[in-house]
From Swiss-Prot:
Organism: Ophiophagus hannah (King cobra)
The keyword Electron transport is annotated on this UniProt entry: no
Identification of the protein by name: Long neurotoxin LNTX37
GO molecular function, one term: ion channel regulator activity
Keywords, comma-separated and alphabetical: Acetylcholine receptor inhibiting toxin, Disulfide bond, Ion channel impairing toxin, Neurotoxin, Postsynaptic neurotoxin, Secreted, Signal, Toxin
Coiled coil segments of this chain: none
Residues spanning the signal sequence: 1-21
């Protein structure tokens, strides 16, 4: 009986682990950590300048992605694959 229970526990843990998805920081009204949708296993941080760059700094976008986005003119993009590996630069200063 104990062997059966132990086997069920091990199988359950293995099944739960197979469904694991990455967690990334995401920008919106505020910066939050969210579980990425299935298939989006990378976190990214994209920065660029807009017309207010001189007064407020670069625009920063954080989120999940399936593949690292293509860099466009005047953008900087970094991608990573561990949980919450894309913190906002101001979060790193704490």
């Amino acid at each position: 009986m104990k062997t059966l229970l132990l086997t069920l526990v091990v199988v359950t843990i293995m099944c739960l682990d197979l469904g694991y998805t990455t967690k990334c920081y995401k920008t919106g009204e505020r910066i939050i950590s969210e579980t990425c949708p299935p298939g989006q296993d990378l976190c990214y941080m994209k920065t660029w300048c807009d017309v207010f760059c001189g007064s407020r700094g670069r625009v920063i976008e954080l989120g999940c992605t399936a593949t690292c986005p293509t860099v466009k003119h005047h953008e900087q993009i970094t991608c990573c694959s561990t949980d919450n590996c894309n913190p906002h630069p101001k979060m790193k200063q704490r």
